[in-house]
Amino acid sequence: MAQIFNFSSGPAMLPAEVLKQAQQELRDWNGLGTSVMEVSHRGKEFIQVAEEAEKDFRDLLHVPSNYKVLFCHGGGRGQFAAVPLNILGDKTTADYVDAGYWAASAIKEAKKYCTPNVFDAKVTVDGLRAVKPMREWQLSDNAAYMHYCPNETIDGIAIDETPDFGKDVVVAADFSSTILSRPIDVSRYGVIYAGAQKNIGPAGLTIVIVREDLLGKANIACPSILDYSILNDNGSMFNTPPTFAWYLSGLVFKWLKANGGVAEMDKINQQKAELLYGVIDNSDFYRNDVAKANRSRMNVPFQLADSALDKLFLEESFAAGLHALKGHRVVGGMRASIYNAMPLEGVKALTDFMVEFERRHG
């Protein structure tokens, strides 16, 4: 079978080594004669999986001891509700920075539970889409927290700055599409959450990192399954967790550690992004409309000079083993998602195809 490179934005490509191990263990895991999908989440075998996954995740991100790590249901959208329901406390407003589609989605959900103070950080610089630097973000004095999304998968926009708003500002961030792709200073945040289906594992699992002093503030109406304190008190097993997703994510964490950890992923991701953006920037046939300072290294949207060629580009790229390159309906064009599991070889195959396609159709 020819090599396939999956550029899907999520559910995304998983490391080949992880899929191979999961395949080998699928019907007989740990010598039990059953699949990991069939064992009790409260049995000692799966408890070991859960504990190792949390330890490895903490190691990868250097999570401080005063932070809890929760393995949850509900995806990023579930956390759009969980964040205000858990950390508003007795306040009624929170700061929300709007830099793209997912930030706006979080704002829409938050309006059910509080009055968001929305700061529109989107700007245009020399005709390109960009984001105002953090020093220009206008935060309110009475907000319970400030929320933003460091990487917008649809817009292809990234905010790589580290928050520095003072110790009294609780920062909540949606890291779904950039978690584990670069080092982050967890201590600068109150809450970090990430859906698993991009850089962690398969869909169905969400990881939350929450500073322990923020526990115990949940609104009385907060569903128990979203209550950080209840999840923490029950070892993320208040109800049956998505065990297979948890197991596979644990394998991904071990793969990351065996391949140099987050620091090495950071280097490789930079190489991949530079290669792809380099082809786009050195061409009149392709374009990307995001300012260089805010370009995402995870999600690279691009357009062809002649949109009439879009269909042919997608057909020929798919035939060449380059899958899931169609852009989101909101933006159009193409989008290459190049998360940790995408090897440099895959991006090289894409750029070679792009150069050849331009030669034939430019």
From Swiss-Prot:
GO terms for MF: O-phospho-L-serine:2-oxoglutarate aminotransferase activity; pyridoxal phosphate binding
EC number: 2.6.1.52
Keyword Cell wall biogenesis/degradation: no
Bound cofactor: record note: Binds 1 pyridoxal phosphate per subunit.
Reactions catalysed: O-phospho-L-serine + 2-oxoglutarate = 3-phosphooxypyruvate + L-glutamate; 4-(phosphooxy)-L-threonine + 2-oxoglutarate = (R)-3-hydroxy-2-oxo-4-phosphooxybutanoate + L-glutamate
Pathway the protein contributes to: Amino-acid biosynthesis; L-serine biosynthesis; L-serine from 3-phospho-D-glycerate: step 2/3; Cofactor biosynthesis; pyridoxine 5'-phosphate biosynthesis; pyridoxine 5'-phosphate from D-erythrose 4-phosphate: step 3/5
Gene3D superfamilies from the UniProt entry: Aspartate Aminotransferase, domain 1, Type I PLP-dependent aspartate aminotransferase-like (Major domain)
UniProt cross-references to InterPro entries, sorted A to Z: Aminotrans_V_dom (IPR000192), Aminotrans_V_PyrdxlP_BS (IPR020578), Pser_aminoTfrase (IPR022278), PyrdxlP-dep_Trfase (IPR015424), PyrdxlP-dep_Trfase_major (IPR015421), PyrdxlP-dep_Trfase_small (IPR015422)
Keywords: Amino-acid biosynthesis, Aminotransferase, Cytoplasm, Pyridoxal phosphate, Pyridoxine biosynthesis, Serine biosynthesis, Transferase
Database matches in CDD domains: PSAT_like
Residues annotated to bind pyridoxal 5'-phosphate: 76-77, 102, 153, 174, 197, 239-240
Modified residues (N6-(pyridoxal phosphate)lysine): 198
GO biological process: L-serine biosynthetic process; pyridoxine biosynthetic process
Record-listed L-glutamate binding positions: 9, 42
GO cellular component terms attached to this protein's record: cytoplasm
Protein localization: Cytoplasm
Cofactor(s) listed in the protein's UniProt record: pyridoxal 5'-phosphate
Assembly, per entry: Homodimer.
The protein's role, per its UniProt record: Catalyzes the reversible conversion of 3-phosphohydroxypyruvate to phosphoserine and of 3-hydroxy-2-oxo-4-phosphonooxybutanoate to phosphohydroxythreonine.
Record family assignment: Belongs to the class-V pyridoxal-phosphate-dependent aminotransferase family. SerC subfamily.
PANTHER family, alphabetized: PHOSPHOSERINE AMINOTRANSFERASE
Protein name: Phosphoserine aminotransferase
